Amino acid sequence: GVALADAAADLLTQFERQGPVQLRQLLDAARRRGRLAGDPGQAQSALSAAMRADNARKTAAGLRQRFRFVAGRVGLTDWLLDADMRRLEREVVLAVERYREAARRSLVRRIQALPARGIGEIVMILLERIGILELQPVRRPGASGAELLLTGNAPGPVSPVATGFVIRRDGRDVGREQVTELRGSLHHFGPAAAGWIVTTGQVLSGAREEAAAPGASAVRLVDGATLARLCEEHGIAVVNTNVSLPLPDPELFEALRNGNGG
């Protein structure tokens, strides 16, 4: 996973002078430092898979891959950049992350400023994009008019899970009381075995503690910040802009150095 890829990147820094190394050499370094154990063949496969998965995640996020595989060896793409380019790239990534955080805060404010119907529509679109099936409105005695109540089937580990959804459209914070109230009223959501509470406000620590209570029905909590992140990830209510940065083509330069450039 991510931790193993991070460990591999850390270990590879010691090989920069000699360039890309055999996977077995990297595996031996990882085992000496206690980063990997077990069967060597399986450990090597896990290490290789972690680095390739990390590259796939970086590519999906529009970022430079960390690892470069060439002729059965692996190295860091950092080695292709000089010190100034590494520094500038780190600054760009940090600036983009700050921009993303500011954009999410702006998105939350814009959603909060919508009328109740608009908030409900955005959340319903998001739920469908996430994979919630058969969304339907329901009624619950004593429910606030600021709440939109829905049932649907959420993706589960084996089969869809009947779920009750409470969409708080007034922007109020969610506390422990709202979690216990949802659990106690799941029978109003048909055969629901789990619940979601979505708000454009905050989720308080008491609510998170209650939602994590062992042995109780699962309740997922989505606050304003999480709502904005999910909208961003699924392309809801956002327009993406891309900034492309040029990097030297390592394969071309290697071919030219070896006299294979044509």
Regions found by a protein language model. Name each.
Residues 6-60, 66-262:
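Mixed-charge (Asp/Glu-Lys/Arg
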Residues 1-2:
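A positively charged, amphipathic N-terminal helix/segment that binds anionic biomolecules
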